[in-house]
Structures are given as structure tokens and as C-alpha cells.
A protein has these predicted regions:
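Beta-sheet ligand-binding and adhesion/scaffold domains
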Residues: 2-31, 35, 62-115
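N-terminal glycine/threonine-rich, aromatic-flanked beta-hairpin/loop signature
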Residues: 28-56
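Short acidic-glycine loop/turn motifs at beta-strand connectors
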Residues: 58-60
Length: 115
């Protein structure tokens, strides 16, 4: 059986699970675009005024760097390696393993598709 390639173009996600060291939360929305293996997203909500990520998707592995302006006025960023999963009932899910570049810490967040 051939699995359909994952495509994030036009997908909107919310943060369904946030690590204690993370900043995004259930109010954060991510708006994805994809061109070939190149993935981009803008995001915001909660304490994130605006954020962007730039990365690549090969198979189910999404790797990106992110930068965000927080409501404190600070700009922070880091890098993430993610597993993208397709769930029959709920759509796409992204399990993000992030490492901050501008502050200490790392952790795991989960994004879920809004359908």
C-alpha cells in the first residue's frame, strides 16, 4: 500500500501540548505553506505576538528554525526536529522537539491540525 506524501500547504494547526520550557500554547495558531520540500509557517497567539519558521520536510521528518517576537518585547528563537504524523480521525499532527538558541532549554510540543 502506497502512503500519500505529507503536504503541509494550507494547513492550520493549534498547539495541543506545550512543554514547560515552551512559549506557544493552546491560543497559538500556525499557518503553513509548502513548496516542494520547503516549509514555511507564520504563527502567533498567547504570549507570541508573531513568529515565523523556515524548514524542510523529507518524508515525515520536518526540520526548521524559528524566530518569534513575544509580548514581553523580547525576540527569541531556536531549532526544531519534528515527526509529522497522519491520523485518520484528526488529521496531521506534528511532534516538535525544540532547542532554544537564545535562552536555555529544550523540550517537546505537539501541534494538531484544525479541520
Amino acid at each position: 500500500m502506497h502512503m500519500k506524501a505529507i503536504n503541509l500547504d494550507g494547513v492550520v494547526m493549534y498547539v495541543s501540548s506545550t512543554d514547560d520550557r515552551g512559549v506557544v500554547d493552546a491560543k497559538t495558531r500556525l499557518y503553513f505553506t509548502q513548496k516542494g520540500s520547503r516549509v514555511f509557517a507564520r504563527y502567533g497567539g498567547g504570549s507570541v505576538v508573531r513568529g515565523c519558521l523556515v524548514g524542510t520536510l523529507f518524508g515525515s521528518e520536518l526540520v526548521f528554525r524559528y524566530t518569534q517576537l513575544e509580548d514581553s518585547g523580547q525576540i527569541h528563537g531556536g531549532r526544531s526536529t519534528c515527526e509529522v504524523q497522519r491520523k485518520a480521525q484528526t488529521g496531521l499532527r506534528v511532534i516538535e522537539h525544540f532547542t532554544w538558541s537564545t535562552r536555555s532549554g529544550s523540550g517537546t510540543n505537539v501541534f494538531a491540525e484544525i479541520r
